[in-house]
Amino acid sequence: MASGGGGCSASERLPPPFPGLEPESEGAAGGSEPEAGDSDTEGEDIFTGAAVVSKHQSPKRATSLLPINNGSKENGIHEEQDQEPQDLFADATVELSLDSTQNNQKKMPAKTLISLPPQEATNSSKPQPTYEELEEEEQEDQFDLTVGITDPEKIGDGMNAYVAYKVTTQTSLPLFRSKQFAVKRRFSDFLGLYEKLSEKHSQNGFIVPPPPEKSLIGMTKVKVGKEDSSSAEFLEKRRAALERYIQRIVNHPTMLQDPDVREFLEKEELPRAVGTQTLSGAGLPKMFNKATDAVSKMTIKMNESDIWFEEKLQEVECEEQRLRKLHAVVETLVNHRKELALNTAQFAKSLAMLGSSEDNTALSRALSQLAEVEEKIEQLHQEQANNDFFLLAELLSDYIRLLAIVRAAFDQRMKTWQRWQDAQATLQKKREAEARLLWANKPDKLQQAKDEILEWESRVTQYERDFERISTVVRKEVIRFEKEKSKDFKNHVIKYLETLLYSQQQLAKYWEAFLPEAKAIS
């Protein structure tokens, strides 16, 4: 159509004058104002002329047109369109030149037409921050909330007995009714809390910290056996594990706001948790569902569009394997340290017996004092074995379970993606069925087919949004998990090294004190 403009070149066609310009610019533009007939029949040439003129204008001049154009849009269209119809086209020329998507047929470089306002240009050119940058900009989650678990108490006799723990909470958060309160909870209550949180949040991609594992042997000893050192050791291990578990729960901003968490911490009596036993009627279907999920996960082959998720999943799987190997070695270390403590105690007793039967007074005194030193060293070995377990072995055990939950979050994202893909496949089948109905000329079933297509189109859109949402949540949760893991490992390793240093210092102190006695033997 541009070639039918009466042989007029594009450089000679200028847009109509803008109201409010300087006198000299009005005079320059008025000399080449196009006729009304040209504007009505060949409106596309107006855009071409506007594009060429904009190339000859300076950026400063182009920017100054914007506020005037806004005034023209308000006044020229609504108040003066009867008197000056050319202003309508002039306004349309500037408006359409801003939108490059409407003039794709002309292939005009939109950036050369007119410059954006400073604020809009800044916003459009500013790169979007990554998730890592957003996490670093945010302040660390600091909740004035401390939960302690103390006083494990056996209630009842025989196999019906159970252990209740005192859960004490100290906080200044307005979410809770008071600053300090305490309740009694049994182990099944902790498991029930995890079941509730997992049911609500895991399907959305959140990493719900897992509770400590069950121990049928340890609990049976506590229920049936007498109170001995092994039962006390088991209860202390479980108490510490439950305390770490509940502290991780309240440190998570999403979990902290959950009403089930507040109810667990505040309410005096909770309804009995059902289905938490492995061999219960409600526990068997859960085992079956887990096996079914494992099989279905093996059959899903996801075409990963984001390399970040693929790399992170590989990192998580490799880290879990390495932690399992390290945990096995640390458990061996703990057992060897306990054996060393027992052997040191036996050695101390033998030295004491030898010293009591020795005739040489100086030698007898030296042997007796050496036996005392060995008893102190046996105590150091026992304390260090406990430190090996609580500071190192339990840390590794916790993160092995946590990494399994992280993998479950990736699996949940994969299941959401698969649901989206299945919906797309179903939608395609519905459309093919509609095409067959059209081909067979069956109008009675056509409306139902169209309704089903609309329904599945809505589902596909919703499932796509669900996938995008869970991808965002999983990414943020993994980044948060890695930060928490780094802090956790740093704190525990520092404490562990401090215990090793203290143990070595005490050993040196004991031997330095004993050395004069050994030299005094005559």
Curated annotation (Swiss-Prot):
Transcription recorded as keyword: no
Key words of the record: Acetylation, Cell projection, Endosome, Golgi apparatus, Lipid-binding, Membrane, Phosphoprotein, Protein transport, Transport
PANTHER family named among the record's database cross-references: SORTING NEXIN, SORTING NEXIN-1
Topological category with respect to the lipid bilayer: Peripheral membrane protein
Protein's UniProt name: Sorting nexin-1
Residue positions where Phosphoserine is found in the record: 32, 39, 58, 72, 188, 280
Gene3D superfamilies from the UniProt entry: Arfaptin homology (AH) domain/BAR domain, Phox-like domain
Stretches for region Disordered: 1-142
UniProt organism field: Pongo abelii (Sumatran orangutan)
